[in-house]
Amino acid sequence: MQKQAELYRGKAKTVYSTENPDLLVLEFRNDTSAGDGARIEQFDRKGMVNNKFNYFIMSKLAEAGIPTQMERLLSDTEALVKKLDMVPVECVIRNRAAGSLVKRLGIEEGIELNPPLFDLFLKNDAMHDPMVNESYCETFGWVSQENLARMKELTYKANDVLKKLFDDAGLILVDFKLEFGLFKGEVTLGDEFSPDGARLWDKQTMDKMDKDRFRQSLGGLIEAYEEVARRLGVNLD
C-alpha cells in the first residue's frame, strides 16, 4: 500500500491518502510540541517509538473488543489505518489529579480519583481545546447522543484494559485522551495512544515517563518513552 497525497499535517503526525478510499497512511514524525504547537522540537527515534507503541496499544484494545482504525504497520514510522469521519471532541479519563485539573481546581497533584473523571474537550488549538460537555455536543451537532454514549463507554473500557496493562509494567496510568471517529457508521477509536497523549508515572519513584518531561523541561524524553515501551514488551527493533 503506497501513500499518495498529503491530506493533513498535525503537530507530530502526517496523514496521506492511498489508492483505497477507505484506508490512509499515518506517519509519525520526530516532532514534539507543547503549548498547542507554540514550542516544537525534534527528537531522534520518536516517530518510530510512537508508531510501534501505538500499534501495540491499539492491538491490545482491539483484543479487548474495542473497534480501532489500526490495520497494520507499514514501516518503522508508518501505519495503515481506516479512514474515519473524526468527531471534533476528544475524551479524557483521569485516574489521578494532574495537569489542567490541578490548575483549575487547586487540588494536590497525584491524588487518586475514584471513580475516574471523564472530560470532553473540543479539538481546537486556536481556542486551546476548551472543555465542553454533552449538552454542547448536542446543541452544536458535534456528535449524536448515541455515538457520544458509545465513545464514553469505550473510553472507560479502554481505561480498565490499560490501567492493568501499565500497572503490570510498574507504571501508573494517570490520565489519557482518546479520539474517535465513524467508520461505516460505527464508532471507532482513531488517532493514537502514546506517551504524547497520556500521563504515565513510575509506581516506585513517581517519575514522569511521558510528554510532561518535554513540557516541564525535565529532559530524557525519548529515554522515558523507550523505557515504557520496554516494560510493556513493545518490540522497537
UniProtKB/Swiss-Prot annotation:
Keywords recorded for this protein, A-Z: ATP-binding, Ligase, Nucleotide-binding, Purine biosynthesis
GO MF annotation terms: ATP binding; phosphoribosylaminoimidazolesuccinocarboxamide synthase activity
EC number: 6.3.2.6
Catalytic activity: 5-amino-1-(5-phospho-D-ribosyl)imidazole-4-carboxylate + L-aspartate + ATP = (2S)-2-[5-amino-1-(5-phospho-beta-D-ribosyl)imidazole-4-carboxamido]succinate + ADP + phosphate + 2 H(+)
Cystine residue pairs: none
A GO CC term assigned to this protein in UniProt: cytosol
Pathway of action: Purine metabolism; IMP biosynthesis via de novo pathway; 5-amino-1-(5-phospho-D-ribosyl)imidazole-4-carboxamide from 5-amino-1-(5-phospho-D-ribosyl)imidazole-4-carboxylate: step 1/2
Listed GO biological process terms: 'de novo' IMP biosynthetic process; cobalamin biosynthetic process
Superkingdom, taxonomy of origin: Bacteria
Family the entry assigns: Belongs to the SAICAR synthetase family.
Matches recorded under NCBIfam families: purC
Protein name, per record: Phosphoribosylaminoimidazole-succinocarboxamide synthase
Organism: Cronobacter sakazakii (strain ATCC BAA-894)
